[in-house]
UniProtKB/Swiss-Prot annotation:
Gene3D superfamilies: Ribonucleoside hydrolase-like. GO terms for biological process: nucleobase-containing small molecule interconversion; purine nucleoside catabolic process; pyrimidine nucleobase metabolic process. One of its GO terms (cellular component) is cytosol. Keywords: Glycosidase, Hydrolase. Its EC number is 3.2.-.-. Hydrolyzes cytidine or uridine to ribose and cytosine or uracil, respectively. This is Pyrimidine-specific ribonucleoside hydrolase RihA. The gene is rihA. The keyword Hydrolase applies. Transmembrane segments: none annotated. It comes from the Bacteria.
């Protein structure tokens, strides 16, 4: 039995690779792809999701665009990381299909209503769409198996000293999600910064020599540019969003702890911080499985193995 999932994303190079990995994995039944603003503007992230699904031949998956901006803040985008299109680097096909004529939240609600078993939500961008779904469809919470998200950090941020980008873009949305009572797995910077892909890994992917692997290598070539800045101290580039899919496929590659996580929505220096109570210093109930380490080679091998399926 394959696991039913909905991917909510803001493509973005690493979102695109997460989509490619998921579509190559028969263990996952992708019920829908929804998009949010984040790495680029909402019209660009929607267009990019359609282009990636066209590339991998999955035009059967329903796609819908979601919120145009965060719940109560101005939109921040990461064009310094992902370029003008959001997927700068490779030449991608234009979409061979149209998005659904409805909002992302409406599409997710429809799928949850019709589902015969609980569905896993996999958000890899800001949590605006997920928060709107949870706030407006409380009757569907029981239809959600869990939320496996990329976001947050127990240590330092990557957009501010305290905050990771996805959470910082819409901290109020993240607050709703983490307070929802639905089981959460958090793939934050603690683990994704250990899930780095190196130059030699990219060359191995290029040598797989099918069209999807070629595009993946070219996506990674561009993604490397930003991460070569010495301030990060990286040997390669961290593949943030694919960690969510890899955890669903091979959780044994990861190490985790269970603890309470809260979202800072007020701090002048700490806005968007994920407060991780690793040592149970509060009485707050455990709400999150926090991933903090990964078998890097196993992770890269999984990606290469699935790319060969194309």
């Amino acid at each position: 039995m394959s696991r039913p999932i909905i991917i909510d994303c803001d493509p973005g190079h690493d979102d695109a690779i997460a989509l490619i990995l998921a579509c190559a994995s028969p263990e996952l039944d992708i019920k829908a792809v929804t998009t949010s603003a984040g790495n680029q503007t909402p019209e660009k992230t929607l267009h990019n999701a359609l282009r990636i699904l066209t590339l991998v031949g999955r035009t059967d998956i329903p796609v819908a665009g979601g919120a145009l901006q965060p719940l109560s803040r101005e939109l921040i985008i990461a064009d310094n990381v992902h370029g003008e299109t959001g997927l700068d680097g490779p030449v991608l096909p234009e979409p061979a299909f149209e998005p659904q004529p409805c909002h992302a939240v409406e599409l997710m609600a429809k799928i949850l209503t019709e589902a015969t078993e609980p569905v896993t939500l996999v958000p890899t961008g800001p949590l605006t769409n997920i928060a709107l779904l949870l706030a407006t469809h409380r009757e569907l919470h029981s239809q959600i198996d869990s939320i496996v998200l990329m976001g947050g950090s127990a240590e330092a941020g990557n957009w501010t000293p305290a905050a990771e980008f996805n959470i910082y873009v819409d901290p109020e949305a993240a607050d709703i999600v983490f307070k929802s009572g639905i089981p959460i797995t958090m793939c934050g910077l603690d683990v994704t910064h250990r899930a780095q892909i190196m130059d030699e890994d990219i060359e191995k992917i290029r040598k797989i020599n099918n069209p999807v692997a070629q595009v993946t290598a070219e996506l990674l070539d561009f993604f490397m540019i930003y991460h070569r800045d010495p301030k990060w101290g990286f040997e390669g580039a961290p593949l943030h969003d694919p960690c969510t899919i890899a955890w669903l496929l091979e959780p044994e590659l990861f190490a985790s702890i269970n603890c309470w996580v809260g979202i800072e929505t007020q701090g002048s220096h700490t806005l968007g911080m994920t407060v991780v109570d690793r040592y149970q210093l509060t009485d707050n109930p455990i709400n999150t499985t926090v991933l903090f380490d990964v078998n890097r080679q196993g992770f890269v091998d999984l990606l290469a193995e699935r790319l060969a399926n194309y």
